[in-house]
Amino acid sequence: MTSPEAVDIPFEPKKILAQLPHMPGVYRYYDTAGAVLYVGKARDLKKRVSSYFTKTQLSPRIAMMVTRIARIETTVTRSEAEALLLENNLIKALAPRYNILFRDDKSYPYLKLTAHRFPRMAYYRGSVDKQNQYFGPFPSAWAVRESIQILQRVFQLRTCEDSVFNNRTRPCLLHQIGRCTAPCVGAISADDYAIDVSNAARFLLGRQSEVMKELEQKMHAFAAELKFEQAAAVRNQMSSLATVLHQQAIEVGSDSDVDILAVVAQGGRVCVNLAMVRGGRHLGDKAYFPAHVESALTLAEGGLGDEADGADGADEAAAALPGEPADEAAAARDAASAASSASSASVEAEVLDAFIAQHYLGNRVPPVLVVSHAPASRDLLELLSEQAGHKVSLVRQPQGQRRAWLSMAEQNARLALARLLSEQGSQQARTRALAETLSFECDDLAMLRIECFDISHTMGEATQASCVVYHHHKMQSGEYRRYNITGITPGDDYAAMRQVLTRRYEKMVEQAAQAAAADDAAGIDGESTRQAEASSLLPNIVLIDGGKGQVEIARQVFTELGLDTSMLVGVAKGEGRKVGLETLVFADGRTPLELGKESAALMLVAQIRDEAHRFAITGMRAKRAKARQTSRLEELEGVGAKRRQRLLARFGGLRGVVAASVEELASVEGISHALAEQIYKQLH
């Protein structure tokens, strides 16, 4: 790995490029502030990195990136496959400004069958283990819940928590309506229930005909033994399964597990539509919109063009280093241009490469990927197969049912992209309307940063404050923050608002002051990059959910911190808290403003204010529920933190502990029979 160049030393690419090896690896570009600009992988580091400094027709955006490079770091790997894996990990961890980025969505839902004697089926998100059975992943929560409803109707598996299952004395409502066989009260044997679980698992794996055939044999066997009630029950089960299969006839194909990936570029944005087929059933799709894909624009619109992140072959053709003979450098550039034209790697292929790497590496991969475009990287498929432990096939021109699925995915991608572009236009119009209403001047409205605060509590209990952020014409959920409010009189919203504003902005003001002091000491005139970064953390507009009282508190805090009070805007609720009746209250003495129901500016204010309220109240409820759940157990004599944790884990919560018998309490590790009796008496 090359040693990082110090930021204060002038960047000299010739010296750095001369030291790079002809080996596979990963390279990283940094700017003067130490921020990562780009992460890439190469079959030949020397040729790949050199191409950025020898090409004569870089797209405007890549050319701008090159001018910002102040430091280069490289990591040598044993193979290009290792470089690809390291590149993917670094892109996810560092989120470089010039890489194509997808939101790291690791929370795909699964349908879980637990390892219980009477397995429970449940909706599940998170990492999977080997103890339980997991089916999926599914594209949405709706797809999981629909599958659970189907299994309830056909196989009648239980869905109740173990703590409920262990404490039932009579069947629940689901048994009465034919959605559960009530194993909790012994209405079905463990062997018969295991058969239902096996059939349900095979159904999820796409072996429906096999299940139907076994059920038919079972029905005839019962009839031959004159067990007509059991035969009728199996017949009803077959009827339910046949109904489900008929309803899903359009969705079911011969494939078991397939993912369909359709990429569409339009209007400067790209959409990747991922459709999932599991067990032969089409489970729906999900649209992804990557960031940093300005190459979706044409060159005339300021995009990257195809050469920005082209295949290694094109870049390696331009391998002439600075200082080589001019004719050789020119020949290399001509070769690079020809290679780039020959490869003509589209933005769709680049985006597909990025999606496959970021979505599948390290996660489950189905055996077949049906794609709308051929990926640019050949090594990616080999690496996926190696990591998955099975061959992963890529189908570019599908036939039959797969072709219909791909066509549907492409259509859904176009619709999702059109909807996004429409919403973006509407949101940008709202941002512009708000800026005009508040007489706020901003050269780039996308950089307008709005923060909104709300206080939530229940009669003074579990007081929490929320801060939500609106930036780049959308809510930035990753920048949301909750603040636990302590040391105030319960129910004092003014004190809570003072505390959260002080905690939020005091540190930002200190950072800006430190940056300015450091620049003064260094003799830097004007605003340096360090000062600009510190100042960029401060919002342009601060919305306060409240009227004159809350705005006055905010004004006092901002005055104490030396901040501009003109950015403070209170949102006073109208009659009945209806949208359209709000009044904007200003901290700098401007006349309160009523905008009316049709105001685009007010729609944006209401959107941000409602999001702050939602974020605050969900946090407050979670905090309150946690406090109420644990407080009663904390009062139990003889029960410390470890025993309390074991009780909650064993019975699933306070309600399960209260419902447990003395014998069940005594079965928990660390709790004797005498202590169990004491706990039982204290809870009843």
UniProtKB/Swiss-Prot annotation:
Subcellular localization, as worded in the UniProt entry: Cytoplasm
Keyword Ribosomal protein: no
Example of a GO MF term: DNA binding
GIY-YIG domain location: 22-100
InterPro entries, A to Z: GIY-YIG_endonuc, GIY-YIG_endonuc_sf, GIY-YIG_UvrC_Cho, Hlx-hairpin-Hlx_DNA-bd_motif, RuvA_2-like, UVR_dom, UVR_dom_sf, UvrABC_protein_C
Keyword set includes S-adenosyl-L-methionine: no
Main location: cytoplasm
Domain UVR: 209-244
Cellular component terms per the entry's GO annotation: cytoplasm; excinuclease repair complex
Keywords per UniProt: Cytoplasm, DNA damage, DNA excision, DNA repair, Excision nuclease, SOS response
Example GO biological process: SOS response
Task of the protein: The UvrABC repair system catalyzes the recognition and processing of DNA lesions. UvrC both incises the 5' and 3' sides of the lesion. The N-terminal half is responsible for the 3' incision and the C-terminal half is responsible for the 5' incision.
HAMAP family listed in its UniProt record: UvrC
Family of this protein: Belongs to the UvrC family.
Quaternary context: Interacts with UvrB in an incision complex.
Listed name of the protein: UvrABC system protein C
Organism listed in the record: Burkholderia ambifaria (strain MC40-6)
Gene giving rise to this polypeptide: uvrC
